[in-house]
Amino acid sequence: MFFPDMLLAAKEMVRVLKPGGKIAVSVRIVPEKNFWVTAIMGAINRNMELPAPQPGAPGMFRCAQEGLIADIFFRAGLKNIYQEEVPGILNCKTFDNYWDMQTEVAGPIVASHGNADELMKEKIKREVYQSVTQKYPDGAINIDSSALIIYGEK
């Protein structure tokens, strides 16, 4: 998702892999299945008017296109390529846990949010709180997510 040249990165992984070795990667799929990202990034983008990324630029959903990484693995020289969607749940328990994780750990979010002044940060937090608590009104913040696992052999 974040390598500038994904094919070059895959070829390097294959180069250092022992014959018969196996490699697996995980990438995020469509935003609609990853509310844990879109809840906060949507609020940041709406409020800070960030420019849209260039098509194909490194980013969270860059690899969401069906078959993209499998094709890169094939072009890098891997065989027996397999991919599978793996749903998950991010068990944050509380909104504060979710907020802290997103604003302290998630690199792209930390960078974007860090550029906001205190008033803007509070506005974004209120919007995200409203969005998250609307989706999970019982207070149990167990946020759906989904990834694609792609596997190949040398």
Residue ranges and their predicted role:
Residues F35, A52-P53, L119-K123, I143-D144:
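Alpha-helix N-cap and coil->helix boundary residues
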Residues N80-P137:
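C-terminal helical/coil "lid" or tail adjacent to the Rossmann-like core of SAM-dependent
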Residues D138-N142:
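Short proline/glycine-enriched turn/loop segments at secondary-structure junctions
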Residues L7-K93, I109, H113:
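Conserved catalytic/acceptor-binding region of the Class I
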Residues C63, G67-L68, D96-D100, K121-R126, ...:
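Short amphipathic alpha-helical patches
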Residues M1-D5:
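A short His-aromatic
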Residues A76-K79, W99-G107, D144-K154:
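Core SAM-dependent methyltransferase catalytic element
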